[in-house]
Every structure is written in structure tokens, then in C-alpha cells.
């Protein structure tokens, strides 16, 4: 069994490599994303909180290419490159955390409901239908407003309340297909426990789909966090994010006369999300190919 899983994992890695070789855009996107994450996290490790919290009025709104400030400064006299790195790190951290929770909850619930089916599955799906029709953005904003001592973990928890639904339904649908395959029926006949069948036999066969779903969920969470921060309902005051940088554009004067304060963050979000989507589409094709050949 261990040898078989090892071969499957090698086959998965090989399939992904081959797809990236064929899809040059996805390959370039992968290299770009790795470079962005390395630069953002390594750079931010050497910054102190005072670097992006302290205000220097004397350096307010310095134009790009000013000595010591390649992309200029913002309304607090803070270097745009520095703020871009810190903001990107904070936005990525929120997106990573929500994506992790989404995948864990979505995979567990999706596999369980898809495997057992029946009345439990019917009731659970009606519950997810109800959650999906709720105005999630408005509810998130209300929670952000009323929760005392709101912080980053609060935001992660609030977003995660609604984020797992789509992943759960996707994993459930694929699990229901796997349940009818011969290897599952053979395991049931041999007396293998339901837990082992679900998470040691069925779930590994969903790995490509899970990876593809993770990339797209991550891109969506970056967009959601950015949107909330742009509206003023994201990360708490004093914690910069890409959304708070773009919020500078809400001032008409700043939008037209000082575009360097918000354009860099907009470009980063656009390129990063597009790169993640290109990678996710390539991984989705790998998942579909592996499913078709089984």
C-alpha cells in the first residue's frame, strides 16, 4: 500500500510538471509567484513595526524616484515599497490561513457526506444551500463592526464561516463518484473501516483536485480580504494591507495627482491573482486528465 501511494505521488508530480511544460503561461506564473512570495516574506522579516507605523510628515507624498524612495511615499511619509511588502505579507497571511481552514473543513465534510450519503447528506446539503444564499459580505461586515477587540484572527474566523461551502460540495461530488469504484467496494468487502476507506484510499485519489481547488480558493481569498480592507472592514487599524493601500484612491485628489500611492498595490493584486488562476487552471486540467484515465 505504501509503495502504491509513493508511485501515485510520483505520478501526480510528473503529471503536474508535464502540464506546466506544455502551458508556458502557467510555468511563468509559477516562477513569478515563487519569486513574489520569497521577496515579500524575506524582505518583511527585516522590518520593524515602527518602520511602517511611525508617521513622517516631512516626507509626505514624495514622488517616485525621489532619493531613497524609488516608488515615492504615502500620506504618512512611509516608503511605498516598504508598505507594499508589509501589506502584501498581511494580505497573503490572511488568504493562506482562510484557505487552510477552508481545505481542512471542506475536505473532511465533503468526503464524509459523499461517502455515507443518505439522509445525513440530504440534510447537510440543504444546510449548505441555506448558507450559500446568505449575503455573506454583509454578514462579515456586521461581525467586523460588532466584535470587540477585533484582530487578524477574528477576520480569519469570520471569513472562514462562509468559505468552506464550495470546497465541501466539490469534494462531496467527486467522493460520490469514487465510492462506486471497484477498489472501494473491495475494501468494504474485506472489512476495512470506513475511516480508512475515506481518508487512506478515497482522499488520496482526490489530491490533484484538492491542489487545484486550493489555488483558486487562495486567489479568491486574496480578493475578498482586499475588498474588505478597501471598504474599511478588513484588517484592524494600524495593520496595512493591499486593500488599505488601494483605499487611497477613494480620495479624488490622491487618485489623480498621486497615483503612486495606490497603483502599485493594484498592479500586485491583479498580477498575483491572475498568476494563481493560470496555475489553478493548469492543475484543474491535470485533475480532469487523471480522472478520465482511471
UniProtKB/Swiss-Prot annotation:
InterPro entries listed in its UniProt record: BP-dependent_transpt_permease (IPR050366), MetI-like (IPR000515), MetI-like_sf (IPR035906)
Major localization listed first in the record, in broad terms: membrane
UniProt keyword list: Cell membrane, Membrane, Peptide transport, Plasmid, Protein transport, Transmembrane, Transmembrane helix, Transport
Pfam name, any one: BPD_transp_1
GO process annotations (BP): peptide transport; protein transport; transmembrane transport
Transmembrane domains' residue ranges: 27-47, 94-114, 127-147, 151-171, 202-224, 260-280
Keyword rRNA processing in record: no
Ranges for domain ABC transmembrane type-1: 88-280
GO cellular component: plasma membrane
Membrane topology, record value: Multi-pass membrane protein
Domain of life: Bacteria
Known role: Part of the ABC transporter complex OppABCDF involved in the uptake of oligopeptides. Probably responsible for the translocation of the substrate across the membrane.
Assembly, per entry: The complex is composed of two ATP-binding proteins (OppD and OppF), two transmembrane proteins (OppB and OppC) and a solute-binding protein (OppA).
Entry protein name: Oligopeptide transport system permease protein OppC
Gene behind the chain: oppC
Amino acid at each position: 500500500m505504501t509503495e502504491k501511494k509513493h508511485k501515485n505521488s510520483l505520478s501526480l508530480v510528473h503529471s503536474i510538471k508535464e502540464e506546466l511544460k506544455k502551458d508556458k503561461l502557467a510555468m511563468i506564473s509559477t516562477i513569478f509567484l515563487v519569486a513574489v512570495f520569497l521577496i515579500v516574506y524575506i524582505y518583511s522579516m527585516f522590518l520593524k513595526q515602527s518602520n511602517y507605523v511611525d508617521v513622517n510628515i516631512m516626507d509626505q507624498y514624495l514622488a517616485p524616484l525621489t532619493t531613497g524612495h524609488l516608488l515615492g511615499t504615502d500620506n504618512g511619509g512611509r516608503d511605498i515599497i516598504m508598505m507594499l511588502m508589509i501589506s502584501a505579507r498581511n494580505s497573503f497571511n490572511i488568504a493562506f490561513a482562510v484557505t487552510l481552514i477552508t481545505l481542512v473543513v471542506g475536505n473532511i465534510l465533503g468526503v464524509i457526506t459523499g461517502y455515507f450519503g443518505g439522509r445525513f447528506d440530504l440534510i447537510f446539503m440543504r444546510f449548505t444551500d441555506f448558507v450559500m444564499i446568505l449575503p455573506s459580505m454583509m454578514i462579515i461586515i456586521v461581525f467586523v463592526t460588532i466584535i470587540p477587540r477585533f484582530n487578524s484572527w477574528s477576520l480569519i474566523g469570520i471569513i472562514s464561516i462562509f468559505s468552506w461551502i464550495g470546497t465541501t460540495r466539490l469534494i462531496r461530488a467527486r467522493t460520490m463518484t469514487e465510492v462506486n469504484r471497484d477498489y472501494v467496494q473491495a475494501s468494504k468487502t474485506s472489512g476495512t473501516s470506513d475511516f480508512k476507506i475515506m481518508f487512506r484510499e478515497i482522499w488520496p485519489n482526490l489530491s490533484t483536485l484538492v491542489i487545484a481547488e486550493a489555488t483558486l480558493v487562495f486567489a479568491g481569498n486574496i480578493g475578498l480580504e482586499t475588498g474588505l480592507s478597501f471598504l474599511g472592514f478588513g484588517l484592524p487599524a494600524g495593520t496595512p494591507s493591499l486593500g488599505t493601500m488601494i483605499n487611497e484612491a477613494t480620495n479624488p485628489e490622491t487618485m489623480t495627482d498621486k497615483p503612486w500611492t495606490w497603483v502599485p498595490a493594484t498592479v500586485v493584486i491583479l498580477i498575483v491573482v491572475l498568476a494563481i488562476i493560470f496555475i489553478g487552471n493548469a492543475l484543474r486540467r491535470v485533475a480532469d486528465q487523471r480522472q478520465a484515465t482511471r
